[in-house]
Regions:
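Stable alpha-helical structural segments in soluble proteins, enriched in small hydrophobic residues
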Residues: 46-50, 85, 103, 190-198
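Glycine-rich phosphate-binding/hydrolytic loop that grips phosphoryl groups
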Residues: 180-212
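Surface "functional belts" at beta-alpha junctions
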Residues: 23, 34, 89-185, 213, ...
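SAM-dependent methyltransferases
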Residues: 1, 200-204, 215, 220-225
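A glycine- and small-aliphatic-rich helix-loop capping segment at beta-alpha/alpha-beta transitions
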Residues: 21-24, 76-84, 130-133
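N-terminal beta-alpha supersecondary unit
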Residues: 1-64
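DPxDG-like acidic metal-binding loop motif
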Residues: 61-95
Length: 225
């Protein structure tokens, strides 16, 4: 039976989840700016709770973004380091999809419009529909001014709004049926999405674990020309 380890540090929340012997264990903390200090201890604690060594993990999943640049880089760095050391593949999972999956789990909704506060007067935006329990992207993920967001062209029925970007609901050009602007990504939901990806053969080598920022001017140094 597959053992998967998932982690997410793309927002204020830091979380890890483990699938082992068909059982899911997880830890979740909202700890802005403390992800780098807490992530590895949380992983070690979860492995100890499951009674397994890190070497028992078959693959690692991580929140690829979009989100806070530093947080996304922490997740990529830790996953690549562990995956290289263990010679295990990785699965990159969208932060927006993870929030949609959490909304599906906690609120029982099948259509979710996710908005994360992207600063600079923009939001990270994506719309998702449930297919056999998996929240799948309808359209594209984008970074946009709130006034430019929209539902998929084939949209029908009611949509649930999730994510911190919905704190600016009066500016977002979509009217949802209900809203939870407090939802942050949880590794338990990232893990669920990663399981679907694993079953489809989407795992890649560690050096292919790349962040998705959606914004070009990220806070990383550029090589001189």
């Amino acid at each position: 039976m597959t053992t998967l380890l998932a982690l997410d540090t793309a927002t204020e929340a830091c979380s890890v989840a483990l699938l082992h012997d068909g059982r899911v264990l997880s830890q979740y903390e909202v700890i802005p700016r403390l992800h780098a200090q807490r992530l590895l201890p949380m992983i070690q604690s979860l492995l100890a709770e499951a009674g397994i060594a890190l070497s028992a993990v078959d693959a690692l999943a991580f929140g690829r973004g979009p989100g806070a640049f530093t947080g996304v880089r922490i997740a990529v760095g830790v996953v690549q380091g562990l995956a290289f050391a263990l010679e295990r593949p990785v699965l990159a999972v969208s932060t927006l999809a993870t929030i949609a999956q959490r909304a599906h789990r906690e609120h029982g909704v099948d259509q979710v419009a996710v908005a994360i506060d992207a600063r600079m007067d923009e939001v990270y935006w994506g719309c998702y529909r449930a297919q056999a329990g998996e929240m799948q992207l309808a359209g594209i993920e984008a970074v946009l001014p709130p006034e430019q967001v929209g539902l998929p062209r084939d949209s029908a029925g009611s949509w649930f709004a999730a994510g911190t970007g919905w704190r600016y609901a009066e500016r977002l050009a979509v009217t949802p049926a209900a809203t939870d602007a407090t939802l942050l990504p949880h590794a338990e939901d990232l893990l669920r999405l990663a399981v679907h990806g694993w079953q489809r053969g989407e795992a890649v080598d560690a050096d292919q674990a790349q962040p998705i920022y959606l914004r070009d001017n990220v806070a990383t140094p550029k090589a001189p020309r």
